[in-house]
Each structure stands twice: as C-alpha cells, then as structure tokens.
Design a protein with these regions (language model features):
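M16 family metallopeptidases and their MPP-like homologs
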Residues: 1-25, 47-53, 103-124, 144-200, ...
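His/Glu-rich zincin catalytic helix
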Residues: 36-41, 45-151, 188, 290-418, ...
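Extended, hydrophobic interaction surfaces within ordered domains
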Residues: 250-253, 257-317
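C-terminal, active-site-flanking charged/polar segments
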Residues: 70-74, 131, 135-136, 183, ...
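Conserved short beta-strand edge segments in small beta-sheet-based binding/regulatory domains
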Residues: 464-469, 565-566
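Short, exposed beta-strand-loop hairpins at the edges of beta-sheets
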Residues: 751-753
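A conditional alpha-helix N-cap/helix-loop micro-motif detector
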Residues: 28-32, 268, 514-518
Length: 767
C-alpha cells in the first residue's frame, strides 16, 4: 500500500522502477566487482558521520576518533548525490490503483508540493511552515469528520494527513472511504465541496487554536522535555537528523521550547497565504483505490473529471467548525481525608481514607526529572462481572462505544481533547475483566483541571447522540457482512480450545451489535464507572502533598459513593484451560502468498520467588537464541522467533509461555521437529556456562537501562504502586542481584516447569 502510494507521488521518476537497493534482478544477480564498486562509490568519508554521546572526555574522544579515522583517504572526484524528482505535472494527474489485496474502496487525492531546501531545515521558518501545513490538514480532517459524524456526508470516513516524502515533497493526502452501497461519485462532491469552501472562505481563529493542540500531540510537544531528563539517545537523535536531513542541531530541550513557541505564535494571518499554496497551487493526483472485484463500481476517468468540474462550478458556503465551551466547575461540597497510613513496603507512599469511603494511594515523587508532573488512576471494583451476563457481547460493544466517545458535561471525548483548558491532559477510559478505570496525566499547571476532569467523568458523564452510536454500529455491521476469512475462523477455534468455551469468549456478532442502543450504553456506563462499587485512586506526582490533598478533598472526596450497585456475577477470569498435549491444525484459502504459522503454548505453574522469576528471564533469552540460531540462521525458516513467558504473581505463579513463527508450508514440519528437540534438550541439559553468562550480561544491562528509563515516567511510578496493592508485585525486588544469583541448574529446572505440564500446538496454513 505505502509503496503504491509513493509510486503515485513519484510518477515518471526512477523511484517507481525500483528501490534504492535495486531491482530484484540486480539483488539476485550482482557480481562481486559491482558490489565493491557500489561500496567505494557511496561508503566514503564525506558521506559519513560519527556520533558519540555519553559520559566522556570530549577532547580525548575527539583525538581518538581522529587517530582511528583520519588515515581513511578522501574520495577523489566523488560521485555527486543526485535527486530524482517526478517530472513537472502539466495539470492534474488521474491514476487508479486496482489491487487484489485491498479490502476497501476509497478516493485518494494527493497534493504534491516541493519540500524545503536543506539550508532552510534548521531555521525557525522551516518549523513554522511545517506546523501551518499540519494545522490546515487537521482543520480539513476535523471538518470532514464532523460532516460524517452528523450524517451530512455520504462517506464512511475521511481524513487528510500531511507528510514528507523522502525530503523531496510535502504531500497532503486525502483518504475518503465510501459506504458499502453508496455512489462513489458522491465522494467527489464531498471532497471538492470542502476544498472549494476552504479556498474561498479560509479558516477561523478557533479552528487554528484547536488544530494547534492536535499538532502539538503529533510532534510530542505536549510532553514535557526537561534538560535534566534528557537521555543519550535524545542527543543522538538530534545529531542524526541534522546529518541526514539538515534539521536543527540544537539541545533537545531547547529545541522543544522553540518549537512550542513557534506553534503557539502562529496566527490567522500566518495561515491565510497557505490556503492557496496547499489547496490551489499544489500538483494534484486523483486515484480510486479498489479491489478488482469492485472495479465495476469505480467511476471512469471521464466521469471523475466531469464531477469535479460540476462541483467546482457550484456556489460554496462557509464551513467553519464551532466549538463548545466547557465548565469544569465541581459543585459538590468539599470532603475530607479521615485517615492516613504509611504503606508498608513502599517508601514515600501513603494510604488515605476519604470521607466518602474512597481509598487513595499517594506517592510523592521528589525528582523534577520525572514526567509528566501528575499521574492519576481511578479504579472501580466493577469489571466484566458487573456487566449483564445475558447480554455480554452487546455489553462489550457498548463498552467500545463508551471508550471511544464518553465525555462529560455535554462534551464528547473528541470535543474535550480540543479544548484549551484540557490541553496537555491525557484522559482515557477502560473496561476490563477485573475493573473499570479512568487514566489521566497532566503537567503541573493543568493538575487541578485533571482532578476536575476525573471527578466530572464520574459525576456528570456524557454520551453523544444516538446518531453517533448508529454510525459505529453501521461500520461494525458492514465489516461483519464480509465473508469471514479462514484465518479468523482458525483464531476463533483456537480461542475456544485455549479457554475452554469460557463465557467471556464471545464474538461481537451482528445480533450483539443490533442489541446495543443508548439505554444499554448508559446502563453499562453506570454499572462500570460506579463509585458505589468501590473506588480506589492511585496518585503519583512531584507536586507537594499539601496541594494534592487540597485537590483530593475538593474533587475526589466530593464524589457521592452511595448510589445503586448491581449484583456482580461470579465468573472467573479467562485463563488457559487446555490440558495435556494437544495439536490443532487447519488449512485455509490462500489470500496472497502461501504460508504457515505455528504457535506452541505452554500452561503451567512456577513459584514466583525473585530467583525463579529471574530464571524465567534466562529461559526466555537463551531459548530464544537457540531457536533463532537453528530455525532462522541454520534453516532459513523464518524472520523472527522467540520464547516468551508470563508468570502471574497475583495468581501464585500461574505461567504461560509461547513460541510463534511464520514459515513456508513445505518447511514447517521440519521446524516443529527442531523446536521439539531444542526445548527437550534445554529442559534436560540446561544452558552452557557460556550461554548462562551471555544471558546474565545482557539481562543485567537491559534491566539497568530499562529501570533508569522507566524511573523517568510518572505513570510507571504510579503503576508500580498499583501493581503492589492490587497484584502483590513488589517493586523493590533487586532484579540485578537476582540475575547474579541464578545458576545453570536453576534455569534448567524452571524451563522444565514452564514447559512440562500442558502443551498446545496450533498450525494454520494458507496454500
């Protein structure tokens, strides 16, 4: 798909004939002299860079680099790098893409514009230009989405994205999907009508400000970047981008601040000239993307051109978006913290009992490098057992609708995300087997609003109109109307074998979708996000305790918890239920190329001591290396394969391990034999001393680096406390010390426990 789109952008250029590496014929048949010539032609000093970042003596390192690399001879008459652009377009281009792998029909429109020269890319003007283009693309997307949402468009979905094509072009790409039985020419009306309205009337200041928030998220400018929290890879990235594309060579934290300032300062007057640049003056490529079986529905070139002319001859109307204002005031009387305790085993964490019965676990993080400044998790004691079990599949679909759309105080989730007072605050809802939750993060200046948002999500929830639910149902029903692929049927059969027809192993079928209405959606929300079912909060922040207590009293202790509760079902969570040794295989109809996917699952139990958990990591690492060496390197049978295990501390050591690989149908039996031999030999003989020490070295290094990286994440700090309280996972375990104590015999024994009880092998082939 991406290659096909790139070929449309580069029509007539060398890129459409082959990749940079060459054609398949060249790759398969090159001579030794040719590859050496290629190496000397392009792998030369003037096209290379050495980037070193770390705790080093810079002068000493520079001298070392000079001594090691200075004797490499400079290239004589070096071959200049050439730029291969597409021929200049003489008017709009019309080129369809008909491909049997496509599962949709869409109108694609490409706007192609020159990319800024290298010498411009390190300037503020470059970033301003980039952000304005993104602002316009986001405004167009939001306008089209609103028309689809309100039923004013005959499209199923529509989006416009701005991206760079290999530093040759800026491309704005529309992707507009038609409804199943709709007239595809209506998509031309939709696209061209929005384009003309944009050209004639431009954009509003409110639209620009809302789009800035989306642009800020796209480029991660909403995430704090403090100088003290920068990592080596941040500096490497800046240096790499400067060398490869000419981007600004600036301290990452400083650059982050500059980029935020540039985006903030963009005005309506800055944006106005770009409307013509993008929507009128760019090269335009029109393409229908479709599967051959739908070719009869695709409009002809003549009909497409004629419809474009008709729409552009019509009178356009303003199409500005309007934005609701939201009141974040919480009107309930302030509550109190009635009891405080230190949490045993967790330094810096306290348990507060509130006057409404809610529990709060507060963790003070005294490190300004940890970002963002606040992580707030709200858990409710509901989960799947609080759903109506006789309408379980419908309830799951209602949950999907809630997660995607639920807001508060008359605003949907999408609208909330565009409001300045909510900018920089992340908010998501989740319904799972054990709980429902609200997950929020915020910078310090928006922390109070984050608490308000959490409270209002509980006390004043809002679901959009039934029309939005119907659109979501229509999309789901359309996808369900397609013939079920063999791979999907195989996956469903495997699910049944693995979980033993668990009552929660249900498909959301057409009957389940039809069974969802707004009454059910509202019922599911009230069942799941229900303080009366038990409400526990986890808060981690570098704000002072006095401030956090104030917010908790004003916004959390105020939440009424005396509402109605439902009688929860007593269904146990889904866990693997297969016993003994089982094999399930199926052959399906070939979709593209023949292949076989083999999955070997193990279900067992390992006592979750620190040493055993460390030994599990050794098993995963060493067995993965053995499998890679034999099945990928020696057999050439797959691209990737690994042994991966999970041990539940909460469930007293219940374990799952899995090996999955994709290969050719004629080879899988040999590879399964290899897999059997490797696992059997490892469980009987264990690792060699060399394997053990290599694994130990890598695991200690990975743990040290991973721990340091995760320690800079406030949500990670908070989730550690949550996992300790809810799942019994001790964050204070010294994994490095545990790795240091593991012996070869420990690894062998744990490997036997992981793989020695219940084994399921599933094999799916398409040929």
């Amino acid at each position: 798909m991406f290659t096909a789109q790139t070929n449309l952008v580069y029509q007539g250029a060398k890129q459409t004939k082959r990749t940079v590496l060459g054609s398949l014929d060249v790759i398969n048949n090159f001579k030794r002299e040719e590859i050496l010539d290629f190496y000397h032609k392009w792998y030369r000093p003037d096209l290379q860079a050495i980037i070193v970042v770390g705790d080093i003596d810079a002068a000493q390192m520079e001298n070392k680099i000079r001594s090691q690399f200075s004797d490499i001879p400079k290239a004589v008459n070096p071959t200049p790098k050439e730029v291969y652009l597409a021929p200049k377009a003489n008017g709009p281009i019309f080129e369809n893409l008909i491909d049997s792998t496509l599962s949709f029909t869409a109108l694609k429109v490409f706007y192609r514009m020159p990319y800024p020269a290298r010498e411009v890319r390190s300037t503020e003007a470059f970033y301003k230009d980039l952000y304005i283009r993104d602002i316009l693309a986001n405004i167009m997307t939001e306008r089209m989405k609103e028309q689809v949402r309100t039923g004013k468009a005959d499209a199923k979905s529509a989006v416009m994205v701005n991206y760079a094509e290999s530093s040759d072009y800026y491309v704005d790409l529309y992707t507009i999907l038609g409804k199943k039985d709709g007239n595809l020419l209506d998509l031309i009306d939709f696209y061209a009508g929005n384009e003309k309205s944009m050209i004639e009337y431009g954009v509003s200041q409110d639209e620009i400000e809302a789009a800035k928030m989306l642009v800020r998220k796209r480029y991660h400018l909403d995430r704090p970047k403090k100088a003290e929290s920068l990592r080596n890879e941040d500096f490497v990235g800046v240096c790499h981008n400067n060398f490869v594309s000419g981007a600004a060579l600036t301290d990452p934290a400083t650059l982050h601040g500059i980029q935020n300032r540039i985006l903030k300062d963009i005005s309506l007057e800055d944006v106005k000239p770009y409307v013509a640049k993008v929507f009128s003056e760019s090269d335009k490529i029109y393409s229908w993307f479709a599967n051959p079986k739908d070719l009869a529905k695709v409009p002809s070139l003549e009909d497409t051109k004629a419809r474009l002319d008709q729409v552009r001859a019509r009178e356009a109307k303003p199409n500005f978006l309007t934005f609701n204002k939201i009141d974040l005031t919480v009107n309930y009387p302030e509550g109190t913290i009635v009891k405080e305790n230190n949490v045993k085993g967790l330094d810096g964490t306290k348990e507060w009992i509130l006057s409404n019965g809610a529990k709060v676990y507060w963790t003070a993080v005294k490190d300004s490098k940890v970002t963002p400044d606040l992580s707030l998790l709200v858990y409710f004691g509901s989960g799947y057992n609080a759903l109506p079990q006789d309408r379980f599949a419908s309830s799951l679909f209602a949950g999907e609708f809630i997660r995607a759309n639920a807001g508060f105080r008359g605003a949907t989730a999408d609208e909330i995300g565009k409001m300045p007072e909510c900018g920089g605050i992340s908010r998501s809802l989740r319904i799972s087997d054990r709980f429902a939750g609200i997950f929020t993060t915020a910078p310090a200046k928006k922390a109070e609003n984050a608490f308000r948002i959490a409270a209002l999500t509980v006390t004043d929830p809002f679901l959009p109109q039934a029309k939005v639910l119907q659109q979501m149902k229509d999309k789901k029903l359309e996808s369900l109307s397609e013939p079920k692929k063999d791979a999907v049927r195989f996956s469903e059969a495997c699910d049944s074998i693995i979980y033993g027809n668990h009552p929660w192993s249900v498909d959301i079928d057409s009957a389940a979708v039809d069974g969802v209405d707004m009454d059910l959606a509202e019922e599911i929300y009230s069942r799941e996000f229900n303080p009366a079912a038990g409400m526990t909060l986890f808060i981690a922040s570098n704000l002072d305790e006095t401030t956090i207590k104030e917010y908790v009293r004003k916004y959390i202790a105020t939440i009424p918890t005396d509402g109605k509760t439902v009688t929860k079902a007593k269904v146990r969570e889904r866990i693997p239920a297969f016993k003994g040794t089982q094999v399930y295989s199926m052959t399906g109809k070939k979709e593209i190329n023949p292949y076989t996917i083999v999955t070997r699952m193990f279900s067992s139990k390992v006592k979750p001591t620190p040493k055993n958990l460390a030994a599990v990591d050794f098993v995963d690492y060493i067995l993965s290396q053995r499998l890679l060496n034999q099945i990928r390197e020696n057999r050439g049978g797959t691209y990737t394969i690994r042994f991966n295990s999970y041990v539940s501390v909460r469930e007293k050591g219940r374990s799952e391990s899995e090996i999955t690989f994709k290969t050719r149908p004629d080879l899988y039996e040999v590879l399964v034999g290899d897999l059997d031999d490797i696992v059997s030999e490892f469980c009987s003989g264990g690792p060699s001393e060399k394997e053990l020490e290599e694994a130990r070295k890598w695991l200690i290094k990975n743990e040290t680096e991973s721990k340091a990286k995760k320690a800079m994440s406030m949500p990670h700090r908070n989730s550690q406390v949550m996992n300790y309280v809810r799942n019994g996972i001790n964050p204070n375990i010294d994994r490095v010390a545990a790795y240091g104590s593991v012996t070869a015999e420990d690894v062998r024994k744990v490997a036997g426990k992981l793989t020695g009880k219940n084994v399921l092998t599933t094999i799916y082939t398409e040929e």
